[in-house]
Regions:
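Ferredoxin-like iron-sulfur electron-transfer modules
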Residues: 1
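Short acidic/histidine-rich active-site segments
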Residues: 5-6
Length: 398
C-alpha cells in the first residue's frame, strides 16, 4: 500500500543500492549477474546460447529438483509455513526455497526475432499486411522489451499478430534492446542511464529514417518497460505520439471476445502496471467480453527477487496463494466446474503466476495471448510467423 507520507520506497531502495555499489559494499549475487547478462547482451548468438542454458536446461533442472524435493517431503512444510527471515538463511534452506515452486514449461524454443529472421541490428523491421494500403494502415512503434522478446516470445508474437489483425503497420526497434530499468533498479544507475541515452539516440535515427510514416502511438507489452519508456520523451522522437499498453490499444480498436465457454478469468495487476491511460480491470473486462475480477497481491517473482532472495519470495508467494485460492472459490461459488485462468500483463508476473499451477490448478496467461488463441485459432503463432515471413516484413536499412 502507498506510504501515508508519500515516500517512494522503490526510489529509496534504488538510491541505497547505488550508494552501496559506489562504496564497494554491494554483494555479488550469481543469479542477479546471470539475469543482467541475459538482459544486457545484444548479440543474437549469445542470446540464443544463454536462452538454451537458462530455459532448456536450467528450467528443466529446477523442475526435476522440485519433483524430487516434493517426493522427499522437503518442500511441503516450508511452503505451508514459510519461516520469517531474521538472518541470512542457510544454503540448504535457500536451495529448498528456490525449488519449492516449479518454473514454467512449454516455452517457445526460439526468440520472437529469431523466428522472424529480424535479428540484424542494422535493419528496422516494418511489419504490415501487404493487402492494405498505407492510408488504411495506422503506423505504431512497438517496443517489446526483454521479457516479451527474449524469454516469453509468445507474448511479443501475440502482440505483433494482434496488431497485424487490426491492420496496423508495426515498426520494431533494430536488434535486441533492453529499456534500462533492470540495470537502474539493480543499483547500476550509470548503466541504466547509458542504455536509455543510447536507445533514445537510436530511436531518433529510426524516426528520421521512417519519416514517411506518421507514427502516433508507441506500444509496450511490459509494465517495467512502460515505467522506463515514460522517461524517453517520445513526444520529441515521434512528435504528437502517445505511449500505450497493447491491451489498451486493442480495446480502443474494439477487439473483444464474445464470451468463452467453460472458462472463467481473474486478473493479476502487476506491481509495475503497464496500463496508465485506462483502468486495468475495465480494459481486461472489455477485451474478455465478461466481468473479470481483480486478484490482489504481488506474485513474488518481482524480476530477479525469486532467484536472488528465494526466502522472501516464498513468503510473498504464500500470501498470493491464499488470494488465488480465495478468488477461485468465489468464481466456483455457483457450482462452476470449468477452467479458471489468471491473466496478467507482465512477463515476470506470467512466470511467477505459472509457478502456482501445481498447488491451485490454475493456468496463467497473458491477456494478448489469450486473445490470439481465441480470435486467431490454436495455431495462431505458426500462422502469424508464416504470414509475416511471406511478404509482410519490410527490412529498412538504418
Amino acid at each position: 500500500k502507498p506510504c501515508p507520507v508519500d515516500i517512494d520506497f522503490g526510489d529509496v531502495t534504488i538510491a541505497m543500492r547505488n550508494l552501496l555499489r559506489k562504496q564497494g559494499k554491494q554483494k555479488f549475487n550469481l543469479g542477479t549477474a546471470a539475469a543482467m547478462t541475459f538482459l544486457t547482451i545484444k548479440d543474437p548468438m549469445f542470446i540464443k546460447g544463454i536462452r538454451e542454458v537458462m530455459i532448456r536446461f536450467g528450467y528443466a533442472a529446477q523442475n526435476k529438483l522440485y519433483k524430487l524435493g516434493k517426493s522427499l517431503h522437503l518442500i511441503q512444510d516450508q511452503v505451508a509455513h514459510p519461516p520469517a527471515t531474521v538472518h541470512k538463511p542457510a544454503v540448504r534452506t535457500q536451495i529448498i526455497n528456490f525449488i519449492n515452486k516449479p518454473m514454467p514449461g512449454n516455452l517457445p524454443k526460439r526468440s520472437a526475432r529469431a523466428l522472424l529472421d529480424i535479428e540484424d541490428d542494422k535493419v528496422i523491421p516494418v511489419i504490415r499486411n501487404p493487402k492494405l494500403s498505407a492510408e488504411e494502415s495506422e503506423a505504431v512503434f512497438y517496443f517489446p522489451g526483454c521479457g516479451s522478446e527474449r524469454l516469453f516470445s509468445q507474448v511479443g508474437l501475440a502482440t505483433q499478430a494482434m496488431l497485424y489483425e487490426v491492420g496496423a503497420t508495426t515498426v520494431l526497434p533494430p536488434g535486441y534492446l533492453c529499456c534500462g530499468y533492470p540495470q537502474t533498479s539493480g543499483g547500476h544507475e550509470d548503466k541504466g542511464q547509458r542504455i536509455t541515452t543510447d536507445n533514445r539516440v537510436l530511436f531518433h535515427r529510426v524516426a528520421n529514417t521512417l519519416n514517411y510514416l506518421d507514427i502516433k502511438t508507441v506500444i509496450v507489452s511490459c509494465g517495467t518497460c512502460m515505467d522506463q519508456l515514460q522517461k524517453y520523451q517520445f513526444e520529441r522522437i515521434f512528435p504528437g505520439c502517445r505511449l500505450l499498453d497493447i491491451h489498451e490499444y486493442l480495446m480502443e480498436k474494439g477487439v473483444k471476445l464474445e464470451g468463452v465457454e467453460g472458462t472463467r478469468y481473474m486478473y493479476h495487476d502487476p506491481c509495475h502496471t503497464p496500463m496508465k491511460t485506462y483502468a486495468p480491470l475495465k480494459v481486461t473486462s472489455e477485451l474478455m467480453g465478461t466481468k473479470v475480477p481483480l486478484n490482489d497481491r504481488c506474485c513474488g517473482e518481482s524480476g530477479t527477487l525469486a532467484v536472488t532472495r528465494p526466502d522472501i519470495s516464498t513468503q510473498v508467494r504464500f500470501r498470493k496463494q491464499e488470494e488465488l485460492e480465495k478468488g477461485t472459490s468465489e468464481l466456483r461459488a455457483d457450482g462452476f466446474n470449468g477452467q479458471i485462468k489468471v491473466l496478467t500483463s507482465c512477463p515476470s508476473c506470467l512466470q511467477g503466476l505459472s509457478r502456482f499451477r501445481d498447488d491451485t490448478g490454475e493456468e496463467a496467461d497473458y491477456i494478448v495471448v489469450e486473445l490470439a488463441k481465441h480470435l486467431l485459432g490454436d495455431n495462431w503463432m505458426a500462422d502469424y510467423v508464416s504470414r509475416a515471413n511471406t511478404g509482410s516484413i519490410e527490412r529498412v536499412l538504418l
